[in-house]
C-alpha cells in the first residue's frame, strides 16, 4: 500500500518553521507589542510595557504553531494564560483591534504577501482572542471557555 501524495498546496513545514522559528515569531510579536501602547483601545488592557510579555507571547505562539512546548513546560501553560486574562473585561472592539494590530505586525515582519501564512495566523489569533474575551469576562470558573490546553495550529 502506498501513501497518498501530500497536497502540494499545504506546506510540509510547521507554521512555526515557516515563520522562521522563535526569531521570526519574536519579530512579529515585537512589532505588534510596540504598537499597543499608543493605541487608545488596547493601552488600557495592557497598561504599561512588561519586560517578559514579548518572550511569553512568542513562546505561546511557538507552541501553538508546532514549535517547542516551552509555554506549557516552563511558563505555566494554559492555566497561566487564563489567569493573565481574568478580570481584564476585554471588549469586542478591543479584541478586533488586537487582531488588526497583530496582523499589521505580521505584515511588517515581511509576511504581507504570504497569504497562506497570513490566513493561518489570523485564524489562530481570532480563535485565541475569542477565548480571551470569554475568560476575561468570566466571574466564575464555570463561565470560563472550555478550551484548557494550548491549541496546535496547522495549515
Please give the residue ranges for each predicted region.
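Heme-based O2/NO sensor domains and their adjacent alpha-helical segments
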Residues: 2-13, 26-107, 111-114, 118-137, ...
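Short, solvent-exposed beta-strand/turn "edge" segments of beta-rich domains on protein surfaces
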Residues: 18-23
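Extracellular secretome segments
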Residues: 133, 142-145, 151-154
Amino acid at each position: 500500500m502506498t501513501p497518498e501524495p501530500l497536497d502540494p498546496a499545504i506546506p510540509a513545514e510547521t507554521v512555526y518553521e515557516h515563520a522562521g522559528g522563535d526569531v521570526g515569531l519574536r519579530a512579529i510579536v515585537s512589532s505588534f507589542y510596540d504598537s499597543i501602547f499608543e493605541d487608545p483601545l488596547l493601552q488600557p488592557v495592557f497598561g504599561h510595557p512588561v519586560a517578559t510579555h514579548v518572550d511569553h507571547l512568542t513562546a505561546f505562539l511557538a507552541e501553538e504553531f508546532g514549535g517547542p512546548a516551552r509555554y506549557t513546560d516552563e511558563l505555566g501553560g494554559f492555566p497561566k494564560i487564563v489567569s493573565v486574562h481574568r478580570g481584564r473585561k476585554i471588549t469586542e472592539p478591543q479584541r478586533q483591534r488586537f487582531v488588526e494590530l497583530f496582523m499589521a505586525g505580521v505584515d511588517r515582519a515581511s509576511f504581507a504577501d504570504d497569504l497562506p501564512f497570513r490566513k493561518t495566523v489570523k485564524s489562530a489569533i481570532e480563535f485565541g482572542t475569542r477565548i480571551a474575551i470569554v475568560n476575561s469576562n468570566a466571574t466564575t470558573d464555570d463561565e470560563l471557555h472550555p478550551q484548557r490546553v494550548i491549541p496546535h495550529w496547522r495549515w
